[in-house]
Amino acid sequence: MQDREFPQNPRIGVGIVLMIDKKLLLAKRKNPPAAQKWSLPGGLVELGETVKDAVRREALEETGLTIEVGKLLEVVELIDKAAEGNIRYHYILLDYLASASGGTLKAGSDVSALKLFDWRDLQQLELPILTREFIARHKNLLFPTSQH
């Protein structure tokens, strides 16, 4: 697999926006970027795989859950430059709303933990800036009855 750091081309990834009991499921990442920070579960689209198939596969791999893929909420771009000015990471991330349809919630090999967060909990977390901004933009959809 092509190295994720200092890539030749942008990488396409998916994010899974999964609400369970009115709480947002986040994964604590093991690998950069955002290592040891809470963010949406997800990962890269594999060659020959549709985006929605990638969402289903990543959900199962990272959370142990089978899901129904809902609507595309947003396309997020992450372009991170190294100190020398060259591109360290370049991701195009497609974040999909999803609902759990089966399985047992269990952290996969790419994550160190999974946890459900309500709106108040999220305000106390150190989140990657793109994750925090995404949640803020979609707070009314994700937490319609919470105090914002």
Regions of interest found by a model, annotated:
Residues 77-104:
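Active-site-adjacent beta-strand/loop module that shapes the phosphate/pyrophosphate-binding cleft
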Residues 95-97, 106-137:
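NUDIX/MutT-family hydrolases
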Residues 20-23, 30, 99-104, 119-121:
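Short loop segments at secondary-structure junctions
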Residues 40-73, 96:
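The catalytic Nudix box helix
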Residues 6-10, 37, 85-92, 111:
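A generic structural micro-feature
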Residues 141-148:
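Acidic/histidine-enriched, glycine/proline-rich intrinsically disordered or flexible terminal extensions
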